Amino acid sequence: MKTLPLTLVVVTIVCLDLGYTLTCLNCPEMFCGKFQICRNGEKICFKKLHQRRPFSLRYIRGCAATCPGTKPRDMVECCSTDRCNR
């Protein structure tokens, strides 16, 4: 009898939308294992590749409110699901 109220509480907590926070990878290496929790308003994960000189790439990853712009020799990929900026 006591398990029914407990079950209802658990189901209610699981079903409620308690707020969704996006997580994105955030490190300068090619293979990244670190991630960050995005702040309120940041709904985009991005990966920017910048070619500094031939055969030298710099990786920049993180959260953003909008997809970052590009400059010459940059490539930017944006996405909107957890850890999608691999």
From Swiss-Prot:
Q: Which UniProt keywords apply?
A: Acetylcholine receptor inhibiting toxin, Disulfide bond, Ion channel impairing toxin, Neurotoxin, Postsynaptic neurotoxin, Secreted, Signal, Toxin
Spell out the subcellular localization from the entry: Secreted
Q: Which domain of life is it from?
A: Eukaryota
Asked whether the keyword Signal is assigned, the reply is yes
Q: Could you name the Gene Ontology cellular component terms for this entry?
A: extracellular region
InterPro entries from the UniProt entry: Snake_3FTx, Snake_toxin-like_sf, Snake_toxin_con_site, Toxin_cobra-type
**Pfam assignment, any one:** Toxin_cobra-type
Q: Does the keyword GTP-binding apply?
A: no
A single Gene Ontology molecular function, please?
Answer: toxin activity
Known function: Binds with low affinity to muscular (alpha-1-beta-1-delta-epsilon/CHRNA1-CHRNB1-CHRND-CHRNE) and very low affinity to neuronal (alpha-7/CHRNA7) nicotinic acetylcholine receptor (nAChR).
Q: What is the similarity comment for this entry?
A: Belongs to the three-finger toxin family. Ancestral subfamily. Orphan group II sub-subfamily.
Official protein name in the record: Probable weak neurotoxin NNAM2I
